[in-house]
């Protein structure tokens, strides 16, 4: 949606606006401000001596005029010219302000080409397909009728103006561009209600919808195009293949399904100012190849009529019928396997009477081709090879793309289109406005049971999209009647639990966007810290029906205000496997509370639903299903995860590449107790032949199938499908490209002789055993030898996949051989060796640990070559001692960039004074050519900085102002500047190395297993410390990073000869309840340094702590001494505790549960700086 600012209204067919926000149609506001400034400077100063006046004036001429009202020079177009006594008077239209003004010829100038680089800011808009109407009286028939008119009447214009005046927000959805006019659907927000202006004018009989005529030169962005010549089903399909028996059995051709697809010819917009429009307006995801997402008249009809259209699908036999194909899979122990029917997900055509000639032409061409096809079929019933492609490719083309499969516990009829989805009408309209392409494969199976209020578990690779559950849950919440039996009190109906604050923030924003298309839900984002008072004082707004939170925050609120959740009906678990992994106890406590509440008799008629969505299956989800769900629907579209759900036995054999064949024979069961069907997967034809020979050498019958044996497909299938007696077995060696053709689902064992190329290929192999997936974990006696088995041969060639294999086996609760652990450890060591050039892991630096080294791309070892403390001048960074620092750039609550201040020899202060002296003497020479990584000067108010160029966004014209990303090398922050702000920096200012240093406050980490600081903690610390001088003790220095503990702000009371500690940064973080103690931080870093054998650096800028005596006369009123648990400590005790040995490590790991050391208190106690810093931790 485009955000608009209306400048001028002529009528609904012509109004002028400015496009706001980040849109591909405009440059930033700052660009126009700089353009206006440059124009005024140029025409006011440069042109005083030489006035650039046009030699002639013509209508339509572009020029620059002086506007008396705006007091500035503006770009304009001459509309008309009139002559007066002494000079000409021109009526000009200001293209950036949408104003018509009279201008004297003396105030008109020739426009310089560089001032025409930016597009006109005022853009002409029109309501799309919305035309004026008038009352037509037929005297002959004595009747009246409302018919289209040529111009808008005054009442319509007045109503349109009143609408736009009363609105608080104007938005538009671009539909077409005609010459210089944008045709849009216009939306206005009035009293928190969004109204489509096009619909409103039509509903009130001020206008009507009219299809664009054929002679209009429109570039449609949404209009579907039907091009018979390009339809692959008619021209690109080999006619001899069309009526081949396999095709008639329901295996449609992919090209047939795409023959009437829609396209979006947005590339027809060639305006220079429209760069990026295609990427901005196309749907957020591509539709599946077989789906047709739009109607032919989707833009021509009123949105109210769209849902009433009848959809028609075109097939080879009848234009009003469709070919459906479905695959039946036998159900085993409550599991049903489905394949999507090969039908379009939406209608293919819906045409009006004015398109009948097109349809007749299409039908005629179709009938002609159909006759030829029947003749060819009669003459040659066997399929012909087309275009010289292989037999395997030909068959794959005939069968089409294999429909994605899904494993279900209960049968679900998928919703293949938005229209057939169980979503509310308002949500459907919102999705259509947002160009939603239609439900994905997973969404088509997930939406129906969730919208019915059932318990649902969804395991899919697309879990990161919250619309998977958000839209159907919003639909359920619209049905207010089912909640009437609930207590009439304040409290949420639905709670969405996310693994961290960042995901919760994302879902909350998405919820806010789509809840506008439903009744008011008043959603709330809850992140509650460790303070009990915070949970007790939390108040929900009246009418709050949805809460988005984390497990720890929710449990704290439950502990203090459990009555708030008496109305809770829907519990949604986002990234369920992560929730159970990182907050297992908290999750089961939440589930127990939910189960206890819904078992109350008064709530029997109210809905109770648990929706769990994740990427991976694990044992905790199985426990969730058994203990807390009622006959849930289970939807799994990731086949490798379905194998875990189906309890497929996972076995890994480690061997050398040269020993694979012997390991294969060891994996085979030569004397099975039950009938055994085994598949051996290979990666090539040669490998298939070798495997077949090896197996047959052991006197076991072995079939084979690869692309060169496609002629034998039917024979192989017949052999495979034969019923086996007990104790007998059949083995088939095949390549992965044969899997879709064979469609095997009854294998009992799969051996991966070659490593699968991707998880999808791995899942496809395991799906061949789907008939033997077990829905419930039975006893070994019940399962016996019926349990499906997967055997993976892992060699040294597959070393890069060892970590992923180990993770999969751990989730499967499989027996992991000790050799695999050793092998994986060696692989990880080798990976770490390759990371020598990578930066040190930011989490390792900030907290002393990395959450998952196995997948982290950064380095986790200290490199003696690159991690030696950097030199700021003649001395290196201090590795110990006391320093004074000024933080300038705050990355997060504990990570800052700033400068070390040396009171004995501050080289930067000297440099800064010299720079100020140099630049104030008119030495501000701007840079003509900017080089990447070049060093320049930059003026900010009265200060001058050294900056290094990181990126240059260079524009074509010299007058254009470049966007340049620079780093302030003495402060650590980055910023965007323009070329004219950069100053030439003499070489003698380059000699001092960059003074910006990274500081990390030690021994504190985010609470609740988070790895990133909550933004409100970062904001608080930023406001507290930025730009202020602090005292700190250095613990460690590596590269350009200094670890400090503590970091305090001190006020010197010279009159009392006393120093007062205002605050300790670490204590401030702990006092907010969002952080906990991290005593292992320093020890882990020092251990890494010892392992790297980096010698202690003797060169140091360390300072001795100041000699101070006395205490603070009064406690800081802004920071009362109050422990996080609510208990206060007298100043004397505070000082005593801080001076005792190891005063800050004696607390519990929570660090904020009122049992930690006194340093975890609110700051404000009376501390002597020397003793406090010298205390032995």
Curated annotation (Swiss-Prot):
Q: Which CDD domains match?
A: Tudor_TDRD12_rpt1, Tudor_TDRD12_rpt2
Q: What is its EC number?
A: 3.6.4.13
Molecular functions (GO terms): ATP binding; ATP hydrolysis activity; nucleic acid binding; RNA helicase activity
Renumbered residue ranges of the record's region Disordered: 1098-1177
**Binding annotation for ATP:** 460-467
User: Which reaction(s) does its UniProt entry say it catalyses?
Assistant: ATP + H2O = ADP + phosphate + H(+)
Protein name according to UniProt: Putative ATP-dependent RNA helicase TDRD12
Instruction: Give the organism's phylogenetic lineage.
Output: Eukaryota, Metazoa, Chordata, Craniata, Vertebrata
Which gene codes for it?
TDRD12
């Amino acid at each position: 949606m485009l955000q608009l600012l209306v400048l001028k209204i002529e009528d609904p067919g012509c109004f002028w606006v400015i496009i706001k926000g980040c849109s591909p149609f405009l440059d930033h506001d700052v660009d126009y401000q700089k353009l206006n400034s440059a124009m005024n400077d140029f025409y006011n100063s440069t042109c005083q001596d030489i006035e650039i006046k046009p030699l002639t004036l013509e209508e339509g001429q572009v020029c620059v005029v002086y506007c008396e009202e705006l007091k500035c020079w503006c770009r304009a177009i001459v509309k008309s010219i009139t002559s007066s006594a002494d000079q000409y008077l021109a009526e000009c239209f200001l293209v950036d302000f949408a104003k018509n003004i009279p201008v004297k010829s003396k105030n008109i100038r020739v426009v310089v080409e560089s001032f025409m680089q930016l597009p006109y800011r005022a853009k002409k808009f029109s309501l799309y397909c919305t035309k004026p109407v008038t009352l037509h009286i037929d005297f002959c028939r004595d009747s009246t009728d409302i018919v289209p008119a040529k111009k808008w009447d005054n009442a319509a214009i007045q109503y349109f103006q009143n609408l736009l005046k009363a609105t608080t927000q104007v938005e538009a959805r671009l539909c077409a561009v005609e010459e210089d006019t944008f045709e849009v659907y216009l939306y206005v927000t009035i009293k928190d209600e969004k109204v489509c202006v096009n619909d409103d004018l039509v509903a009130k009989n001020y206008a009507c919808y009219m299809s664009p005529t054929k002679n209009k030169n429109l570039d449609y962005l949404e209009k579907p195009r039907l091009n018979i010549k390009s339809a692959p089903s008619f021209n690109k399909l080999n006619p001899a293949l069309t009526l081949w028996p396999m095709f008639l059995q329901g295996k449609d051709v992919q090209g047939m399904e795409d023959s009437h697809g829609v396209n979006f010819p947005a590339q027809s917009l060639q305006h220079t100012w429209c760069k990026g429009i295609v990427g901005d307006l196309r749907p957020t995801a591509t539709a599946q190849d077989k789906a047709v997402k739009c109607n032919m008249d989707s833009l021509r009809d009123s949105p109210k009529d769209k849902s009433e259209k009848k959809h028609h699908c075109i097939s080879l036999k009848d234009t009003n019928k469709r070919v459906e194909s479905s695959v039946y899979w036998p159900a085993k122990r409550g599991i049903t396997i489905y394949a999507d029917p090969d039908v379009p997900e939406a209608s293919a055509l819906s045409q009006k009477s004015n398109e009948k000639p097109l349809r007749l032409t299409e039908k005629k061409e179709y009938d002609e081709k159909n006759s030829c096809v029947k003749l060819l079929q009669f003459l040659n019933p066997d399929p012909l090879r087309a275009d010289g492609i292989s037999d395997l490719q030909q068959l794959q083309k005939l069968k089409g793309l294999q429909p994605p499969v899904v494993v279900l516990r209960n049968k679900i009829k998928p919703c293949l289109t938005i229209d057939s989805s169980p979503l509310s009408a308002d949500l459907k309209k919102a999705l259509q406005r947002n160009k939603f392409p239609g439900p994905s494969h997973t969404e088509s199976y997930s939406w129906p049971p969730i919208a019915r209020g059932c318990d649902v578990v969804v395991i899919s690779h697309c879990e990161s999209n919250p619309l998977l559950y958000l839209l159907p849950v919003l639909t359920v919440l619209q049905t207010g009647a089912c909640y009437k039996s609930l207590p009439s009190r304040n409290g949420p109906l639905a709670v969405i639990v996310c693994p961290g604050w960042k995901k919760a923030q994302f879902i909350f924003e998405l919820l806010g966007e789509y809840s506008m298309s439903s009744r008011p839900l008043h959603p709330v984002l809850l992140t509650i810290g460790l303070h009990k008072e915070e949970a007790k004082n939390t108040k929900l707004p009246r009418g709050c029906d949805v809460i988005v939170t984390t497990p720890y925050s929710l449990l704290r609120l439950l502990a203090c205000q459990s009555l708030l959740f008496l109305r809770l009906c829907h519990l949604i678990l986002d990234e369920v496997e992560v929730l159970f992994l990182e907050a297992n106890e908290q999750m089961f406590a939440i589930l127990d509370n939910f189960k206890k509440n819904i078992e109350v008799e008064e709530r029997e008629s109210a809905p109770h639903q648990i929706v769990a969505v994740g990427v991976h299956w694990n044992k905790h989800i199985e426990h969730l299903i058994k203990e807390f769900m009622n006959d849930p629907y289970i939807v799994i579209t990731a086949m490798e995860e379905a194998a875990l759900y189906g309890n497929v036995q996972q076995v890994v054999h480690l061997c050398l590449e040269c020993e694979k064949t012997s390991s294969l024979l060891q994996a085979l069961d030569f004397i099975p107790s039950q009938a055994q069907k085994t598949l051996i997967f290979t990666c090539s034809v040669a490998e298939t032949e070798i495997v077949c020979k090896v197996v047959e050498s052991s006197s076991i019958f072995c079939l084979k199938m690869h692309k060169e044996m496609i002629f034998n497909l039917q024979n192989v299938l017949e052999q495979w499908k034969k019923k086996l007696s007990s104790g007998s077995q059949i083995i088939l060696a095949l390549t992965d490209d044969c899997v879709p053709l064979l469609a095997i689902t009854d294998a009992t064992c799969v051996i991966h002789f070659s490593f699968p190329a991707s998880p999808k290929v791995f899942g496809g192999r395991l799906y061949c055993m789907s008939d033997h997936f077990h829905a419930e974990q039975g006893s070994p006696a019940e399962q016996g030898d019926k349990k499906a088995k997967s055997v993976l041969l892992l060699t040294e060639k597959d070393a890069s996949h060892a970590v992923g294999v180990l993770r999969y086996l751990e989730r499967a609760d499989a027996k992991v051989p000790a050799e695999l652990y050793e092998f994986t450890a060696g692989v990880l060591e080798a990976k770490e060796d390759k990371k020598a050039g990578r930066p040190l892991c930011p989490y390792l630096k900030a907290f002393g640990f990395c959450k998952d080294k196995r997948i982290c791309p950064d380095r986790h070892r200290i490199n003696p070559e690159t991690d030696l403390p950097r030199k700021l001048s003649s001395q290196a960074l201090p590795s110990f001692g006391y320093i004074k620092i000024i933080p300038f750039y705050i990355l997060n609550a504990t990570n800052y960039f700033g400068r070390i201040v040396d009171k004995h020899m501050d080289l930067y202060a000297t440099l800064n004074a010299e720079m100020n002296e140099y630049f104030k003497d008119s030495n501000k020479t701007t840079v003509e050519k900017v080089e990447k990584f070049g060093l320049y000067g930059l003026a900010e108010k009265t200060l001058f900085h050294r900056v290094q160029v990181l990126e240059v966004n260079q524009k074509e014209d010299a007058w254009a102002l470049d966007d340049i990303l620079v780093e302030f090398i003495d402060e650590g922050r980055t910023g965007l500047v323009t070329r004219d702000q950069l100053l030439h920096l003499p070489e003698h200012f380059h000699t001092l190395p960059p003074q910006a240093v990274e500081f990390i406050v030690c021994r504190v980490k985010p609470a609740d297993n988070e790895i990133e600081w909550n933004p409100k903690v970062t904001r608080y610390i930023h406001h507290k410390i930025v730009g202020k001088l602090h005292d700190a003790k250095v613990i460690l220095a590596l590269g350009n990073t200094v670890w400090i503990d503590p970091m305090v702000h001190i006020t010197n009371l010279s009159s009392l000869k006393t120093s007062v500690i205002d605050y300790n940064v670490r204590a401030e973080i702990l006092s907010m309840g969002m952080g906990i103690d991290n005593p292992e931080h320093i020890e882990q870093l020092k251990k890494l340094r010892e392992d790297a054998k980096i010698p202690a650096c003797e060169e140091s800028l360390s300072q001795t702590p100041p000699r101070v005596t006395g205490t603070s006369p009064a406690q800081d009123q802004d920071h009362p001494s109050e422990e996080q648990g609510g208990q206060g400590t007298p100043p004397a005790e505070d000082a005593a505790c801080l001076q005792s040995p190891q005063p800050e490590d004696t607390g519990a790991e929570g660090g904020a549960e009122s049992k930690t050391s006194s340093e975890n208190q609110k700051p404000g106690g009376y501390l002597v700086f020397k003793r406090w810093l010298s205390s032995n931790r």
